[in-house]
Structure formats: C-alpha cells, structure tokens
Amino acid sequence: MKHLHRLAALLALAATSAFAGPPYLTDDPVPTDTGHWEIYAFAAGEGHGSTLDADAGLDLNYGASPGVQLTATVPLSFAHEPHQGWQSGTGDLELAVKYRFFEEHELGISAAAFPRLILPTAAHAPREHTRMLLPLWAEKDFSGGTSLFGGGGYMINPGRENRDFWQAGVAVTQDVSKRLSLGAEVTRQGSDTDGGTAQTRAGLGSSVQLSDHYALLFSGGPTWADHRTGYHFYAALSLVY
C-alpha cells in the first residue's frame, strides 16, 4: 500500500528524545541521558477522508554512554481504506543509534547523526527489503526557553517501483511554563515511489509534564501529498527514568 510506505517514512522522522523529537516529526540531537530510559507508548498516523494508516506501539530509548542513544521502535499497524475495511498486524521494526558528535554549551549548539534501520516485518504490507534512513540533526537553544532544531537525511528505499528520497524538517519550541511546552514545525519529503509526488507537512505540538517521570505529548496538522490535503497526528505517554 502506497499510504503505508508514506506512514513508515513519517514515523522514521519522528524519532525519540527527551527535550524535542516527540511529539514532532523533526528530531533533535539530544540523546537519552547515560544509564537512563525514555519509553513512549504512542499512536501515530495519517490519512485523508476515510483512508487511515496508523501505528501504535512502544518507542524504547536507552542512554548507552555519554552522547550515545540506542533506540528500538516496536509498532502494531492499522489501516482502513474504502471498499477494503480495516486491516491490522505487526508493523515494521525500527532500530537506530543516535550519536551526538558536537556540543557547545556556551553557544547552546549541538549536532548528531541518527542512522536508522527499518526492517520489513509488517504483516499486512510485507516488504522484501530493509530500508535505511541516514539523517543529521542540529539544535540551537536560546535564553527564555526557546529551541530551534532541524535537519534531515537520505532514505535508502529499495524495491520495485520505489525511490530513494531526501527528507528534512525544522521546528521551534517554547517553554510556556515548567510543565508546558508548545511548538510548530514544517517537514518536506521527496517522492518515495516512481511517479509519486513530494509531501509537505505542517504541525503544531505540545508537551505536558505530568510529574518528574511522566508526560503527555500531542501533535498534528495538515499533509499535502498526491495533489490533495490530508492530516497527520501523534500522541504519546512518555516515561523517563
């Protein structure tokens, strides 16, 4: 299903980090603190009209060493299309390593690589090939609780009628209080199939800190693809310990 190809690319953008990343598609270079876990119970997807492609599952992140984060995303996939009804099954397993290779505290600037493997484990949209995303992410923190982060990378997308493509995003967040952060982002992705079109997404997001360990995260907005307007969304409960 072409829509599921697009959803997988969307979820690959939505990586995991304590200070940005979720709920945004755009990631940041901040890894999980060494010896700590960040776990996200999430639901994410996109659609248009009565068509919906969504994943629900766990994002598991561990701070393996200073500047290094190990990530595994384990989803269940759901899809609905007119005349076909609902389908569900295991999603594509994702494995990634984030490596922060630059950090300047005084300037508030950092950068990281976050290569990601997307394994062909989905039950209702089986693939024969493993995909790989090769992104770079950077961030600038300002006084007053404002952060600007973004970057992008190249998706190696083998398979019949598939195309490799570039994708990029930029986001800005503002700490409104100690427990509330708001943000906005724009992302762009090239065509992932022969004869397909590029995709642009805009979104608003928020993070509500419930306690020292738990937070609620939300984002969503319009998606422009295939000469029509759809929508995308992300919601999660995060646990950091």
Q: Model features per residue range: what roles?
A:
Residues 19-241:
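Transmembrane beta-barrel domains of Gram-negative outer membranes and organellar outer membranes
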